[in-house]
Amino acid sequence: MSRRKTTPSAGIVYRLETTKKRDLSVEEIRSVFEAGGDELVDMFLLMFLLIGINVSDLFALTKENIVRGRLEYDRAKTGRHYSILLHPEALRIIEKYKGENKLLRFSEHFRNVDVATVMINKKLAKVRPGLTTYYARHTWASIAFNIGIQKDVVSLALGHSFGVRVTDTYINADLSRVDEANRRVIDYVLYNKK
């Protein structure tokens, strides 16, 4: 008697779903900057100015994360270290909403990051229906690429690997390329300078 092998997934067809587009056009992000002034909307704008920092990372920041004019932190999702030059536009928001124990007071007002995220997203939805914190990172990346910043610099700014993890250990990335890319994105969005 022969045994027929079966697999639990036999006959199942898998579809790869593409990631939902979560980027704003330049005009749309400009309109969010124009609507700014509310603390929670300004947290979204700060996320954009900081190359799309995640809410959980922003929530966890303390004053010790600012070192010699740079924001130094390890991303909670990946553990990867980030070092972002604090441009004046970001510093203005940080100064306006500085916390006592945390870098930003919104981190002290909410019980946890999940509550903070829900509240930010509710406020953003009033500015633009469907807008969430995820848009900050996606929008920064799309604008950077569309104004001519090389894809490898965009990837470096977002903390993506260069493909071979072993190679990454040998590469000492020039952060000035990321600093310049972020300055170009900010200048284009806020001052229409390409």
Language model segments and positions:
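Conserved tyrosine-mediated DNA breakage-rejoining catalytic core shared by Y-recombinases
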Residues: 11, 50-53, 59-96
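Catalytic-site neighborhood detector that most strongly recognizes the C-terminal catalytic loop/helix
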Residues: 23, 75-79, 158-184
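Active-site/catalytic core of tyrosine-dependent DNA strand-transfer enzymes
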Residues: 25-29, 87-129
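Short basic/aromatic active-site micro-motif
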Residues: 129-147
